[in-house]
């Protein structure tokens, strides 16, 4: 907690990029947001602090999900790598004894996963893919087919060029094959191959899909590993 002209706030070492950053939460932002904004900018002048937005490629590298892009109300926590928020074992800090929206359905889903069943069709995975460097936010979902081609089986949500790896990366949904990580949470099968149908702007050959392969998320470790990364197995 900090006090700036008696403005109470909470500082969290978190962010939307995976970098070493901080977020400031005012306890009453409806009244004092402008005060805090100006105070932070004034204090940062000597450090050449400036207003920017998080780099999309770092958000994607860190595997941080964007609401409406990587998930929405149609998805459940297990299929978008948030299964750690719902206890699979019935033990530990995520064993939610209190009631919450969707509890019965999620507990049933968790039980089915432990039994080797597949209670949903698509799983969010990390992909490395070919094509020309993707340097702009995708305005639409790009379709994914099996390695041998054919009809679409999934779709890309957040693609970008990875400058360190010199390849395109993406998060996307592909058919869930029942793979679980060491902690019992669903994930994609590392090394499984697909085809991605890129727009002409990024295609090596217009009309021809590029190769893609499932890799681990995050694509790059965050400065401060979050719970999702710790339990990813």
For each feature predicted by the language model, list its residue ranges.
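Conserved, structured C-terminal
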Residues: 4-233
């Amino acid at each position: 907690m900090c006090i700036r002209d008696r403005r109470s706030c909470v500082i969290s070492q978190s962010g939307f990029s995976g970098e070493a950053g901080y977020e400031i939460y005012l306890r009453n932002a409806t009244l004092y947001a402008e005060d805090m904004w100006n105070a932070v900018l004034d204090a940062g002048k000597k450090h050449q602090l400036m207003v920017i937005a998080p780099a999309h490629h770092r958000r994607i590298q860190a595997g941080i999900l964007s609401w409406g892009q990587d998930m929405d109300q149609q998805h459940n926590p297990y299929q978008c790598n948030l299964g750690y928020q719902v206890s699979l074992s019935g033990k530990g800090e995520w064993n939610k004894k209190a009631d919450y929206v969707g509890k019965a359905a999620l507990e049933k889903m968790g039980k089915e996963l432990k039994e080797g069943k597949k209670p949903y069709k698509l799983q969010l995975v990390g992909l490395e893919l070919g094509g020309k460097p993707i340097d702009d936010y995708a305005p639409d979902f790009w379709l994914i087919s099996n390695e041998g081609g054919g009809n679409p089986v999934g779709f890309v949500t957040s693609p970008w060029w990875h400058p360190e790896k010199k390849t395109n990366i993406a998060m996307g949904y592909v058919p869930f094959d029942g793979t679980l990580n060491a902690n019992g949470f669903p994930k994609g099968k590392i090394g499984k191959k697909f085809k991605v149908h890129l727009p002409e702007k990024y295609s090596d050959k217009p009309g021809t899909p590029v190769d893609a392969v499932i890799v681990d998320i995050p694509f790059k470790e965050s400065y401060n590993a979050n719970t999702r990364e710790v339990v990813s197995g």
